[in-house]
Regions:
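Bacterial signal peptide processing site
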Residues: 14-19
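Short coil/linker segments at helix-helix boundaries
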Residues: 20, 37, 66-91, 177-237, ...
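Canonical positions in the second alpha-helix
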Residues: 46, 91-92, 125-126, 159-160, ...
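Structural marker of alpha-solenoid helical repeat scaffolds
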Residues: 49-50, 95, 129-130, 163-164, ...
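Residue-level recognition of tetratricopeptide repeat
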Residues: 53-54, 99, 133, 167, ...
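TPR alpha-solenoid repeat register
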Residues: 56-57, 102, 136, 170, ...
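Canonical tetratricopeptide repeat
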Residues: 59-61, 105-106, 139, 173, ...
Length: 306
């Protein structure tokens, strides 16, 4: 009787799995024809028929749900499609943990759905286990950049650079990031303004100069100088590691230019920044000195004519 029961149970499970696979194949047909809602319905029936789960069903269900997502949408239908995909990829990871696609598609779906809070919590959890987890740090930089969390993206970029002090590009990246921010926040239209008095005009008769205005949200004054100095600090680090780093020299010039815009009401300080910017621009554009190949034949010494 016990043997018969085991056989019946095994046979029943086998039939359930066969039925599930039949519905999965039907779902695949709908998927290929572009009817993604119908495909999802068939995959859900397959799940009901075989509750133990088939990883391929969850994979295809998740992909079908992703096809119903609309970039940038916040509608209820979008949220249902996102949740459907995430749940399917979560089950796939549980059923087939050695298959990297489950985890990769789960993360990609979070990115595509702008679920940045979930991603941030996930990577910060990784950092609690290992504060120097470079993969988690790089992921946080990516997430915060996508979410336009500039301060957080900068914080983690600085963390990466501090953990890799001998990586010139890590230092350079922080400097470039800061330059871009300065340019976007009030630095695009100030280059033509010179706050110094015109030496050809009598100071008593010279009209008052009006600097180009900043707008709400721009970096200005002491805050602009502070941020520029931070970028200069990291660009200096890049040049300490790689003294011939021409791109870093070029951005050093640009950073000093942006710093000068914090001194539009202080001509002397403005002039120091502009002159320093020109010095760095000159270094960046200097021709590379020609070097003789190490294995080049040496010229024979001249002989005195006899």
């Amino acid at each position: 009787m016990a043997l018969l029961l085991a056989t019946l149970v095994t046979t029943g499970v086998g039939c359930s799995e066969l039925q599930a696979r039949h519905h999965a194949r039907t779902g695949n047909g709908h998927f290929l024809s572009g009817d993604y809602p119908a495909a999802v319905r068939e995959y859900e029936i397959a799940e009901q028929k075989y509750p133990q789960g088939l990883h391929v069903v969850e994979l295809n269900k998740g992909l079908a749900c992703r096809q119903m997502m609309v970039p940038g949408s916040k509608s209820p239908e979008q949220q249902r499609a996102v949740d459907c995909a995430l749940n399917a990829f979560t089950k796939m990871k549980e059923l087939r943990p050695e298959d990297p696609r489950g985890g990769q598609l789960y993360v990609q779906t979070l990115f595509d759905a702008d679920r940045f809070d979930t991603l941030i919590a996930m990577y910060e959890g990784d950092l609690k286990k290992d504060p120097n987890d470079m993969a988690a740090i790089n992921s946080l930089i990516n997430v915060h950049s996508r979410a336009d969390h500039w301060s957080e993206a900068l914080k983690w970029s600085m963390k990466r650079a501090d953990l890799q002090p001998k990586d010139a590009e890590a230092q350079y990246t922080v400097g470039v990031m800061i330059y871009n921010r300065l340019f976007q926040k009030g630095g695009a239209d100030k280059a033509a303004y010179d706050p110094r008095p015109d030496p050809n005009v009598d100071p008593k008769k010279a009209p008052a100069k009006t600097p180009p205005p900043f707008t709400l949200g721009d970096l200005m004054g002491t805050e602009r100088v502070r941020v520029a100095d931070l970028g200069i600090q990291y660009m200096n680090r890049a040049l300490e590691v790689r003294p011939s780093y021409r791109e870093a020299m070029g951005f050093m010039s640009l950073l000093y230019r942006q710093k000068a815009f914090g001194y539009l009401d202080k001509p002397a300080e403005w002039e120091v920044c502009v002159n320093t910017a020109e010095e760095w621009r000159g270094k960046a554009t200097q021709p590379v000195p020609a070097t003789q190949p190490a294995n080049a034949p040496q010229a024979a010494p001249e002989t005195t004519p006899t």
